[in-house]
């Protein structure tokens, strides 16, 4: 029976492995989940209940979908500004800055692999060959749990039914541990790229990464999800900038390039941290499903993202440019938006119909507390195959709720799974193909990059699985 209950996930992952598009796999996986829930669901839901479960999942996916659309518009509006950034001299510090700071900053604020694109392009401008450039750009995805202002992490928390505030600092701790063990891999790949770090570079970047990870944990303990990673990155980026260019580099041209990002951070801070503004924007709020989160449209990060994107477009080319921007945004975002609805709907059907609970009881009866190790592996597999931490959450969160009892252990296991799924999106076929097309790399060069990244796979999956198992054993 457990294989029947698992069949929606098996079908979804199997279709992707066979080369089908994620949209087709998501559609068929959702249909399969509905049929299995109706025929063999432990809670015996009728058709109306299954439709309600899917609708509740789609409702959870709505805020994320709006951020996907608005974030893509924001990214597209700033493409030319990114292309006109000052070129850097070919040295290790410039490479590390592109891959470890600038790429993660753009990924957290916009998502969609924008940080990866910036990092791989930056590496190529420094004279790095195509294969090592693809491998090094992977490090721009180290903060994907906060990518696109954290929409994937928010969805995972909603599916699992856990407190977002309690989850995000645990995700930050797991990320900090991985940041420490992955930095030597970055140095190794840098040597292969012929931009090796000197001792001074190692000391500087070890210090900067330690500072970044400490700030990341602190920010996630005190700030909302949307602001935490940006707040951690900003002072580290400023410190690096001042060390390289000094205060003389803080000119009006730099301010003009950064203005959209500054406006975004200020808007998010006002919306989330100023009680008078937050309370005013909290209404209207909609909660059509008792077991799904409320949604306040005026508090959505999508609002400042789309407003800033339109302002930038209008300043460049008037209303015509703004209309062209929105047309292009909707063309590119449509598939991602639909896939988000399908994946969250499928996961919610599995949770609401009792499929996830039935799986948990069956597996736990055999493996006991060791079954917790399955969750980050499932997250990693979902992230790798879909290229999306929303997809990773849709695969792993139903298992987390089923296999791990509620409490501290479940939060730790979910944090490990979110990080595993997020960091495996960095080496997913979706992400790597994006870089391959951008820099016109051959299949052989792409394969060389992936072979160089085998420690990334091993460290991410190994450490997150160990954390999940330790949390379950100590509970």
Give names to the regions the model predicted.
Residues 2-3, 59-63, 86-99, 126-133, ...:
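Membrane-interfacial loop-to-helix junctions in multi-pass transporters
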Residues 4-13, 20-42, 64-70, 209, ...:
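Hydrophobic mid-bilayer segments of alpha-helices in multi-pass membrane transport proteins
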Residues 64, 76-81, 105-117, 143-150, ...:
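Short helix-coil transition sites and intra-membrane helix breaks within transmembrane domains
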Residues 90-121, 338-345, 368-400:
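Hydrophobic alpha-helical transmembrane segments of multi-pass integral membrane proteins
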Residues 92-104, 129-146, 166-179, 370-384, ...:
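Alpha-helical transmembrane segments of multi-pass membrane proteins
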Residues 114-125, 151-162, 390-403, 431-443:
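Re-entrant/interfacial helical elements at transmembrane boundaries that shape
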Residues 132-238, 409-410, 433-467, 475:
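Membrane-core helix-loop-helix motifs of multi-pass transport proteins
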Residues 232, 236-383:
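Transmembrane helical segments that form the transport core of multi-pass membrane transport proteins
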């Amino acid at each position: 029976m457990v294989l029947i209950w698992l069949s929606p996930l098996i079908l979804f992952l199997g279709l992707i492995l066979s080369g089908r598009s994620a949209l087709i796999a998501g559609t068929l996986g959702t249909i399969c989940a509905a049929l299995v829930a109706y025929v063999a669901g432990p809670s015996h839901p009728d058709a109306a209940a299954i439709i309600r479960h899917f609708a509740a999942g789609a409702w959870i996916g709505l805020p994320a979908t709006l951020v996907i659309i608005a974030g893509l518009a924001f990214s597209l509006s700033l493409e030319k500004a990114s292309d006109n950034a000052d070129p850097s001299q070919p040295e290790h510090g410039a490479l590390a800055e592109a891959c470890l700071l600038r790429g993660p900053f753009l990924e957290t604020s916009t998502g969609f692999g924008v940080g990866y694109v910036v990092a791989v392009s930056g590496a190529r401008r420094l004279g790095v060959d195509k294969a090592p450039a693809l491998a090094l750009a992977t490090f721009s995805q180290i903060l994907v749990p906060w990518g696109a202002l954290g929409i994937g992490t928010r969805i995972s928390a909603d599916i699992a039914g856990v407190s977002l505030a309690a989850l995000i600092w645990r995700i930050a701790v797991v990320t900090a541990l991985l940041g420490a063990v992955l930095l030597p891999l970055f140095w190794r790949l840098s040597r292969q790229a012929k931009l090796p770090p000197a001792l001074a570079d190692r000391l500087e970047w070890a210090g900067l990464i330690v500072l970044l990870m400490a700030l990341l944990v602190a920010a996630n303990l005190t700030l909302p999800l949307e602001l935490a990673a940006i707040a951690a990155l900003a002072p580290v980026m400023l410190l690096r900038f001042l060390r390289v260019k000094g205060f003389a580099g803080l000119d009006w041209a730099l301010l003009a390039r950064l203005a959209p990002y500054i406006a975004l951070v200020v808007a998010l801070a006002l919306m989330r941290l100023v009680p008078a503004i937050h309370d005013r924007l909290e209404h209207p709020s909609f909660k059509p499903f008792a077991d799904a989160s409320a949604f306040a449209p005026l508090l959505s990060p999508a609002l400042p993202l789309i407003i800033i994107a339109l302002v930038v477009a209008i300043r460049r080319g008037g209303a015509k440019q703004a209309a062209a921007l929105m047309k292009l945004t909707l063309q590119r975002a449509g598939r991602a938006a639909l896939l988000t609805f399908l994946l969250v709907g499928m996961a919610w059907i599995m949770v609401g119909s009792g499929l996830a609970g039935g799986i948990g009881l069956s597996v736990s009866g055999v493996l006991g507390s060791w079954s917790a190790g399955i969750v980050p592996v499932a997250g990693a597999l979902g992230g790798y195959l879909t290229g999306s931490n929303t997809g990773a959450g849709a695969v792993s969160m139903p298992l987390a709720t089923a296999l791990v009892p509620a409490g501290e252990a479940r939060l730790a296991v979910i944090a490990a799974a979110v990080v595993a799924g997020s960091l495996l999106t960095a080496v997913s076929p979706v992400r790597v193909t994006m870089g391959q097309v951008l820099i016109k790399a051959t299949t052989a060069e792409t394969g060389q990059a992936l072979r160089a990244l085998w420690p990334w796979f091993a460290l991410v999956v190994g450490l997150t699985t160990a954390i999940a198992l330790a949390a379950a054993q100590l509970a």
